[in-house]
């Protein structure tokens, strides 16, 4: 019994496979989806999507978008996505420190918004790398 999951970014199809379970980073918190889930349309936040195939969890970083769940099919349209296998934890931690410093030094709303987005991406990269390491 599986779910069909498709993650589509503007430039490519990020994921197109079947899985037993998916946990989405929605704008209202984490949403777990199993076979037979009721129809759902939700906004996707910057964060880590976790996909369970058999007993293994695969993390994918989503950079905002929308998800539709219907008839055991999950279609996720995202602004962007990153594969975790390409993330170096040391660089991610350095980026988190840099993003935190830039946010603390931001002087106007535009800079604060941009710095906040960069901080959230950096946190998601670290979280995804940790999921993969466990």
Swiss-Prot record:
User: Where does this protein chiefly localize?
Assistant: plastid
Q: Name one GO cellular component term.
A: proton-transporting ATP synthase complex
CDD domains the record matches: F1-ATPase_delta
Xref: InterPro entries = ATP_synth_F1_dsu/esu, ATP_synth_F1_dsu/esu_N, ATP_synth_F1_esu_C, ATPsynth_dsu/esu_N
Q: Does the keyword Thylakoid apply?
A: yes
Membrane topology of the entry: Peripheral membrane protein
Q: Which GO terms describe its molecular function?
A: ATP binding; proton-transporting ATP synthase activity, rotational mechanism
Compartments where found = Plastid, Chloroplast thylakoid membrane
Q: Which UniProt keywords apply?
A: ATP synthesis, CF(1), Chloroplast, Hydrogen ion transport, Ion transport, Membrane, Plastid, Thylakoid, Transport
Answer whether the UniProt record assigns the keyword Acyltransferase to this protein: no
Similarity annotation: Belongs to the ATPase epsilon chain family.
What the protein does?
A: Produces ATP from ADP in the presence of a proton gradient across the membrane.
Subunit comment: F-type ATPases have 2 components, CF(1) - the catalytic core - and CF(0) - the membrane proton channel. CF(1) has five subunits: alpha(3), beta(3), gamma(1), delta(1), epsilon(1). CF(0) has three main subunits: a, b and c.
PANTHER family tied to this protein: ATP SYNTHASE DELTA/EPSILON CHAIN, ATP SYNTHASE EPSILON CHAIN, CHLOROPLASTIC
Please identify the protein, giving its name as recorded.
ATP synthase epsilon chain, chloroplastic
Provide the species name. Answer: Gracilaria tenuistipitata var. liui (Red alga)
Q: Which gene encodes it?
A: atpE
């Amino acid at each position: 019994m599986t779910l069909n999951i498709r993650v589509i970014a503007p430039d490519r199809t990020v994921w197109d496979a079947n899985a037993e379970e998916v946990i989405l980073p929605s704008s209202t918190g984490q949403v777990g989806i199993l076979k037979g889930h009721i129809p759902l349309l939700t906004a996707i936040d910057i964060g880590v999507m976790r996909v369970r195939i058999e007993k293994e969890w695969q993390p994918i970083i989503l950079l905002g978008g929308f998800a539709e769940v219907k008839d055991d099919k999950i279609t996720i349209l995202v602004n962007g996505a990153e594969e975790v296998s390409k993330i170096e934890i040391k660089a991610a931690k350095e980026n988190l420190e840099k993003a935190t410093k830039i946010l603390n030094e931001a002087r106007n709303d535009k800079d604060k918004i941009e710095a906040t987005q960069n901080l959230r991406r950096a946190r998601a990269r670290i979280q995804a790398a940790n999921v993969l390491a466990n």
